[in-house]
Structure formats: C-alpha cells, structure tokens
Amino acid sequence: MKKLVCGLTLCLSVGNIFAGSTKDIYKKNWIDFNKNGVKDVYEDPAAPIEARVADLLSQMTLEEKTCQMATLYGSGRVLKDAWPTAEWSKEIWKDGIGNIDEQANGLGKFGSELSYPYANSVKNRHEIQRWFVEQTRLGIPVDFTNEGIRGLCHNRATMFPAQCGQGATWNKKLIREIAKVTADEAKALGYTNIYAPILDIAQDPRWGRVVESYGEDPYLAGELGKQMILGLQAEGLAATPKHFAVYSIPVGGRDGGTRTDPHVAPREMKTLYLEPFRKGIQEAGALGVMSSYNDYDGEPVSGSYHFLTEILRQQWGFKGYVVSDSEAVEFLHTKHRITPTEEEMAAQVVNAGLNIRTNFTPPQDFILPLRRAISEGKISLHTLDQRVGEILRVKFMLGLFDNPYPGDDRHPETVVHNAAHQEVSMKAALESIVLLKNENQMLPLSKSLNKIAVIGPNAEEVKELTCRYGPAHAPIKLSLIHISEPTRPERI
C-alpha cells in the first residue's frame, strides 16, 4: 500500500495527494489528521496530552520521527519556495518537519514581499501549515519559531531596547509588558514559539554579544528573564530561553572560538551562569531551551548528557524540547572534533538530550546521518521515541493539534505595532537611558542653544533601522536629516 501511495503521488496535484477532498478532514471540534475517517486518540482534543503523544508515536514511522528532529529555515534561506509546490512531495519534509524558523518575517531572500502587509505573512504561514496538515500522512503541524529578544523579529513589528537596555530599567513589570506586546504580535501573525529571552551573563566586555544580555548579574537576568518567559507563555506561546549554557564567557571574548574560558570553575558555572536558566525553567516553566555551540571543560554543551539531561531534565524538571543554536550540532564534528563521523555526531547529541537540530543547511544534512546512526544501533528506538515525544508534547501544549492555523489573516494590523504597543516601546526606551555623569549641568540641554553638533558614522544615515534579533525594517530613522523633525508616533 505504501508503494502504491508513493507511486500515485507523482501523478496527483499537490492539493489531491490523499483520496477525497482534504476539506473532509476538518470535522466538528476535531481534525482527522491521518485522514482515516476515525477520531484517533491524538486527534481528540478531550484526551489527555500524554495519551495523545503515545498514540501519535505509535503510528509514526522512523522517517516521520526523524523528520520531527530538524528545523527547516524559511524565508528563502533553506526553504527556497515562497509557497508550497508540487515538488515538496519529493522533499524530505514530505514526512513532516519539527519547526520552521523565521518564515516570511521580512528577512532572507523574500524580504518584504511576504511579510508586509502583515496579513500576507499570516496567509503564507497558513498555507505552509495547511500543506503539512493536509499533504503529509499523519498531518503533524509545524511549530513556527521566531526571534523576539527586543520585539518580534518581523517586518515593522514594535521594537524595544536591546536586552542590555531592558536590564538597565530594573523594571520587572515593564519586562512583562514587553513580553505581552511581543506575544500579542506573534500570536496575531501566527508564530507559536519565540526564541527569547537571552539569559547569558555578560561579564567580559570583549564578548561581541554583550548588548544582547540583561547584564552581568545573575539575579537581575533571572528575574527579568522570568518575567519575559511568563509573559510570552501566558499568551499561549512557547518561550525558548538561550543560550544554554556557559556561552557568554569564551576564551579571549572570541565568540567564534566556541571555547569557554577554563577559569570558570564548577561553582561559578552553577551559581553565576546557570542560575538564570534554573529560574526560567523551575519558576517560569519555559517550554523550550536553545543549546549553545560552546564547550565546557572540553565537552560541547549540545552533546553533553550532563547539561541536557542531568541538569536540565533531572535536576530542574524541564518538560519541553531542546533546539540547538545554528550549527551547534555540526561543531561537534568540525570545531570541537570529538566525533569522527556525522553518524557519531548525530548519536552524541540525541543521546545527550537534544531534540531538534538547527542550521542554515537543508534538514536532510542531519536527518540522514541520524537515520544511519539509528540503523547502526548508536541510538536506541526508546531514546528516539523519548526525544520525539518531547517535541510532540510541546506541540500539543501549544494547541497545534486543535487549531493548526493561529493568527489573524484579516486584520493583524490592529495588533501589530499599534498605538498602545508604541507607547510601551517609548516607555521602555526612556527607562533604559541611565545618566551616569552630568558634568557642568550639561543636561538637560538649554532651549537657548542655536546649534547642536551631530557627529559620528551614522550622522547622515537615512536607512530604516535594522537590529539584531528584533523587528526588521523598523520605521525608525536616526540622522542629521531627521533630528529636527517633530517626533511622531510612527517613528517609535
């Protein structure tokens, strides 16, 4: 029967791979994801989540399970097509995919053609989700992930100060407001998982990502990060704090070296660098964690059973799924050089506790070595089911099997970057500014001044602001040309 279905697939259009109309799968109060005409346990919204996970796992093939363990980068980076095509039935994701990252958010090949007006991007994600629900055998929905450390990483979403600026506010209530704005805009646009907050501790100013941290203090980072996680997940999204663990103190401040400074002792590692993550997991209940690409004491974190299982799951009780930072898995093989083959690489990260591999390369670059590692006995079927089950559990908790099409494809502009959200942005910007010294009462500037010198490399910059891991093409201009213009809400 499987051979017959595969043969027919080549002859049928993308909208008619399965017998009958795909509209028939949408029943009253449930969806017939596997298209068998029967309400299976995993399709029953009233069934307990653990029962739904177990039922779905029991129906999955090895190919379908391994496809859940990879990210497909969207927006033309890896996923070259803007919309589903008939050729997708020949791609490895014909058996599903774990998540799709940054699809139609304004970055990558497609730019603004899909991301704005906002309704365009919602319709795009809905059509891609519809393909996975209707054209794959079991119809497992995709988790649409995106960045969001300073506002949602989407074209013209509401921007906030970088996390170092947010940290300077020392305002937990404000961080919760920022989280709600980010979550509301993500929900309106159909994203389901936000890669935030960054909980790395910045104590070496040479490190190039200091600006992305809440600061140098683990209590501050933990308290603010907790509010961000609670705020995102209160709106039905998954929060994925990063980068776990001990990532922000590389030797010489060199991020690309991937080597944690050997002077970081175990006690310092636990009380300083791990404490914000512990709080995010145990006190805020984060559903995701992103593993980092550095090592600690010579062991790559993304391939460490101690970090991903003993600490994260056994000590802290983490119940979500672990996604790797981009290329963190491959670094075991290419930078850390502790695995002689790609199969050994796949086996080490999965056995350690990693659920989903992310990289800017096709998902089969990981899925195929993963399958070979399983066939060679390097990964047990029990471990495979455990890792895939953790992914599915999060998808059930997000409600993707009850409503695979979140988002407002009609009027998302009433939510995204609305006036109320701009007010929160302005409030955060003002509170993030800290005056350390005011020699000769220079501030506030006298209204009697006739001239103000605007000096620096961006003095005449007229392009819209592009930030790291926040809104793309934000309508903010900082230049000599615009400084004399009156402030307008749309410039926030």
Where are these regions (language model features)?
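Positively charged n-region of N-terminal signal peptides that target proteins for export
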Residues: 1-4
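Positively charged, low-complexity/disordered segments
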Residues: 485-488, 492
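Short, linear, compositionally biased motifs with a strong N-terminal bias
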Residues: 10-11, 490
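Glycoside hydrolase catalytic-domain context in secreted enzymes
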Residues: 18-484
